[in-house]
């Protein structure tokens, strides 16, 4: 089933923030917190410190009305910089690959900052774009089993 969620970026305190939100909304995580150490190492990427390996790669928390907020920690070693405009992303999870492509093509029109749709290690087709109005969109299509 298609869904829309809000994706939040943090600089090292995603777990602290989400522990707080979990208490505020009296809810539980949708699955375990995924850590940076759980990501397959990129031989061309930076070597993560032990502290960075423990940071949040991905977490999901249902809040009001079933809306899900998600988060990650941005890594300075990967030259990520948290600033207004990249701290919040609208995550789209369409039902089909075709709909994912259609939405990506439409929202990336006129954009200069996109990561094209690609197959990822977690089994999804994923991409991002900052649209011409300055809104960041993330696309995640996972085929049904």
Locate each region found by the language model:
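Vicinal oxygen chelate
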Residues: 2, 31-34, 63, 67-82, ...
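Core segments of cupin and vicinal oxygen chelate
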Residues: 8-66
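Detector for Asparagine
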Residues: 9, 13, 44, 86-87, ...
């Amino acid at each position: 089933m298609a869904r829309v969620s809000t994706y939040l970026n943090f600089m090292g305190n995603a777990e602290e923030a989400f522990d707080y939100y979990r208490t505020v909304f009296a809810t539980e995580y949708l699955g375990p917190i995924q850590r940076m150490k759980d990501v397959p190492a990129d031989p061309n990427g930076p070597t993560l410190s032990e502290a960075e390996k423990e940071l949040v790669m991905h977490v999901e928390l249902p809040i009001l009305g079933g809306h899900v907020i998600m988060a990650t920690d941005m890594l300075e070693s990967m030259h990520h910089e948290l600033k207004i405009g990249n701290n919040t992303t609208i995550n789209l999870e369409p039902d089909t690959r075709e709909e994912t492509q259609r939405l990506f093509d439409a929202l990336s029109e006129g954009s200069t900052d996109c990561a094209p749709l690609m197959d990822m290690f977690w089994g999804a087709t994923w991409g991002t774009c900052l649209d011409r109005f300055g809104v960041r969109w993330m696309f995640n299509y996972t085929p049904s089993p």
